[in-house]
Amino acid sequence: TIKENNFNWWEKKLNHNSKYADALRLDHVLGFFRIWSIPKDNIQGVLGYFQPAIALNENDFLQRNIYFDEKRFCKPYITESLLHDLFLDEAGYVKEKFFIQNVYGLFDFKNEFDTQKKLQEFILQEKNEVQHQKILSKLLYLHSEIILLKDAENGFHFRVNMQQTFS
């Protein structure tokens, strides 16, 4: 029956979901019911979640006696030692160029690099900068050092393999 309707249902579904992400992944049988959605500011699949999904909210955590700190759960958790372990001799340059240190002694991406998309666009513009090309994958990785993803409706989804992050 789907073919008889010229796959109209699929076309509508994909068009609707394109409002939420630039890339969609159909995954086996789940593709008939849910689509893996990667928000437009992200590049890597680990920063996506299924749509539709029942998102978590702050009360879901509070009801389980878990203090909810949106910044802690949804922003990369980057320590000085993590930067040194990843970037070795380039850690000083990376800190100065891409990060600001916050009041807790952790590092936040500067506004101009606070999404994977912004970071990738900057690196692609720096064609002569071999140093930037080498560190791109590590910087993208640091963007995924989170526990939760916040969706457009202010719901929260666990990051894939969040238990394997340093966060």
Which residues fall in each region the model found?
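Catalytic cores of glycan-processing enzymes that make or break glycosidic bonds
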Residues: 1-167
